[in-house]
């Protein structure tokens, strides 16, 4: 890990050596109010600060400023107005304890004159954020004279890192916490358990880490797709393991305590996620009696009909709560298969006893019970939006990832929500042309798209719903991210867009933000982070940047094979609206098909036309199970009844290719009114995505 001083040494040495107007300063997130004043303040060597903080609050602050900024502080009852650097806390201890959930208690005022810097806030958290702004203002030991008043928009400004699919060391986690603090992010969602490996020491259940914290292959995809995939015992327990391709690790309880304290010193709350009842392959491997079948490798769900499952989860959660003081405990709740529950005698008995109509209600029953346990222990349940299926537990908070509607629905019903919709907030998706970028997981989310996302739609601004939207979070799933450099490349700078969304009420627009990102990215690189350089961005797929002019534009389309409703794009007008898709399948221009018919559509040209060329593009994205068709057939007809095949193409693309856009092209001359395009799938469960049928391109 880069030592703690790296931020002081690198972040404080931002690129410019002369003072620029404040509007050009690279402050991220943009402050609420900033006024330029005459002059500059010099950070002289040996500068010391004074503060009225005392006790543990003073100790934490002084340790941080000494280590990171090389500025020690003294604690005094009434900081002198003559002191060159003053931090003044005006609030109470009770307010300090409430600050993490209150935007007003996180605010600060920063006043810089040629002779003094004063930061005033009601809480230590607010003072800390004032220091981060001060650090971003400093250039070449000079700070421009300014007056800033600043308060965040949302109390929850988060980042999630998946540590199950690939394990990240304590130092690597701390490094990201440092950057989070610098950009005023305050929630770290720690995804600790999943099928890729269990990462937290649980003293009552040692087999979780002894048997499933390591696996026999570092490449998650290769390992996961094996029919006989194997976990590996802790290599420290093996007589001979050198040379074996063992990947993994886990955090001891001492590791976790250290990281929790490290985060707290930066005013970051860590929210642990313990997946249940799905995504539990590793649990039922170590303790197969907790599955419906009693056998490992037969399911990924816990048996929610067995009492011992609840005993196990409650015992695990007791140890979790001893380590993490967070209000919320995240229980996952997403993507449970529920397959074995349908035939499991224990699950069926519970369904009968509690009059549950389906397995979705059975999962809801499980979630309600876990929530009662957490509530009885003074905590609250947070889960992915699948916990809304069945009936939502009464006090649960929802993390909305499958779009925005689930979150808005939960908020309307009075539940607190964290917005993390995958199309905007999943940082493991491609951020530029997928054919030139490192391997990523589905989708395409460029910086501008992430920046433009607003957790509260315009229609709901100023309504009572706003108070239930706690904030926004970026998420990094690491199935295809093995190395720290790759992890950081995916996180930065898109996380900076979410930092600004979470903090700044009146944003200045993407063009201004992009300029600030360039400076911030350079600073990140000097500090040892492998950030994506937005100056090298290729941008949107060229074909998507303008309307395609062709004779089929606006013509009616008959669907003999229906598109999937969740990938409907613009419905029946999609394939002749002149709009080609971007690099990603989620942005509303690509239409998805998965039924047995595949793509089978007829374009009515309105009259018999000389058809000279027909084009269509098909996406191939391996990890999203979107494949180029097995066959593409072009047919024509004058009457719409009798069709003649004029072309049949077998693309011959290897399904092992990560990403490509296959261009189907036909040229010739045929008179017809109806143009029919058919495309069959390579595999029964594979998707076909296409965006436009271009006829007689102009």
Question: What function would you assign to each model-found segment?
Answer:
Residues 1-26:
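Bacterial Sec-dependent N-terminal signal peptides
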Residues 24-156, 486, 497-532, 536:
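Contiguous, structured surface segment used for ligand recognition
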Residues 26, 101-301, 305-310, 316-328, ...:
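Feature activates predominantly on carbohydrate-active enzymes
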Residues 167-169, 195-201, 277-283, 330, ...:
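Flexible loop/turn segments at secondary-structure boundaries
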Residues 197, 583-650, 658-698:
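Aromatic, loop-rich ligand-recognition surfaces of beta-strand-rich domains
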Residues 283, 289-293, 297-394, 401-408:
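Active-site neighborhood of glycoside hydrolase catalytic domains
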Residues 381-386, 391-396, 402-547:
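Flexible, acidic glycine-rich loops studded with aromatic residues
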Residues 546-582:
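Predominantly extracellular/luminal regions of secreted and cell-surface proteins
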């Amino acid at each position: 890990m880069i030592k703690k001083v790296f931020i002081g040494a690198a972040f404080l040495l931002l690129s410019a050596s002369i003072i620029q107007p404040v509007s050009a300063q690279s402050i991220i997130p943009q402050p609420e109010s900033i006024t330029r004043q005459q002059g500059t303040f010099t950070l002289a060597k040996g500068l010391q600060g004074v503060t009225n903080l005392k006790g543990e609050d003073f100790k934490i602050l002084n340790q941080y400023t000494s280590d990171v900024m090389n500025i020690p502080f003294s604690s005094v009852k009434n900081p002198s107005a003559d002191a060159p650097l003053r931090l003044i806390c005006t609030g109470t201890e009770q307010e300090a304890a409430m600050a993490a959930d209150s935007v007003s208690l996180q605010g600060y005022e920063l006043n810089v004159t040629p002779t003094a810097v004063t930061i005033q806030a009601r809480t230590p958290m607010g003072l800390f954020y004032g220091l981060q702004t001060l650090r971003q203002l400093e250039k070449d030991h000079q700070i421009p004279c300014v007056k800033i008043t600043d308060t965040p928009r949302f109390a929850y400004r988060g980042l999630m890192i998946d540590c199950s699919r690939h394990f990240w060391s304590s130092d690597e986690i701390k490094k990201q916490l440092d950057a989070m603090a610098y950009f005023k992010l305050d929630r770290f969602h720690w995804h600790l358990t999943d099928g890729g490996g269990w990462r937290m020491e649980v003293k009552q259940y040692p087999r979780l880490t002894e048997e499933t914290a390591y696996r026999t292959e570092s490449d998650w995809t290769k390992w996961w797709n094996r029919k006989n995939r194997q976990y590996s015992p802790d290599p420290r327990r093996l007589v001979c393991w050198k040379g074996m391709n063992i990947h993994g690790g886990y955090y001891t309880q001492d590791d976790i305590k250290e990281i929790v304290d490290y985060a707290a010193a930066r005013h970051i709350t860590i929210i642990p996620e313990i997946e249940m009842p799905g995504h539990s392959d590793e649990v039922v491997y170590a303790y197969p009696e907790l599955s419906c079948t009693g056998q490992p490798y037969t399911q990924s769900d816990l048996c929610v009909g067995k009492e011992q499952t609840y005993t196990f989860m409650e015992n695990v959660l007791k140890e979790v709560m001893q380590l993490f003081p967070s209000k919320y405990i995240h229980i996952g709740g997403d993507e449970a298969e529920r397959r074995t529950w349908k035939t499991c005698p224990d699950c069926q008995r519970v369904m009968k006893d509690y009059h549950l109509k389906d397995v979705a209600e059975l999962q809801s029953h499980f979630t309600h019970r876990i929530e009662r346990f957490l509530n009885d222990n003074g905590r609250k349940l947070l889960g992915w939006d699948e916990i809304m299926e069945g009936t939502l537990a009464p006090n649960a908070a929802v993390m909305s990832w499958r779009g925005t509607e689930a979150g808005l629905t939960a908020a309307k019903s009075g539940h607190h929500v964290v917005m993390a919709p995958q199309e905007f907030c999943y940082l493991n998706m491609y951020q530029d042309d997928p054919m030139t970028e490192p391997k990523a997981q589905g989708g395409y989310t460029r910086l501008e798209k992430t920046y433009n996302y607003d957790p509260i739609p315009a229609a709901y601004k100023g309504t009572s719903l706003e108070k239930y939207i706690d904030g926004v979070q970026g998420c990094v799933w690491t199935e295809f991210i093995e190395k720290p450099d790759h992890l950081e490349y995916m996180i930065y700078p898109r996380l900076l867009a979410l930092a600004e969304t979470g903090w700044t009420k009146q944003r200045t627009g993407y063009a201004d933000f992009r300029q600030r990102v360039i400076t911030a990215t350079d600073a990140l690189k000097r500090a040892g982070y492998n950030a994506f350089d937005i100056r090298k961005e290729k941008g949107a797929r060229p074909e998507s940047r303008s309307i395609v002019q062709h004779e089929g534009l606006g013509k009616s389309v008959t669907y003999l094979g229906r598109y999937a409703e969740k990938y409907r794009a613009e419905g029946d007008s999609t394939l002749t609206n002149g709009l080609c898709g971007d690099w990603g399948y989620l942005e509303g221009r690509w239409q998805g098909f998965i039924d047995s018919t595949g793509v089978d559509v007829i374009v009515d040209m309105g009259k018999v036309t000389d058809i000279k060329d027909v084009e269509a593009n098909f996406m191939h994205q391996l990890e999203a199970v979107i494949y180029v068709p097995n066959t593409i057939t072009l047919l024509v007809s004058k009457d719409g009844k009798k069709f003649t095949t004029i072309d049949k193409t077998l693309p011959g693309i290897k399904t092992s290719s990560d990403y490509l856009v296959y261009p189907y092209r036909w040229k010739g001359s045929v008179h017809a009114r109806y143009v029919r395009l058919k495309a069959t799938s390579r595999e029964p469960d594979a998707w076909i995505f296409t965006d436009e049928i271009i006829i007689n391109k102009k």
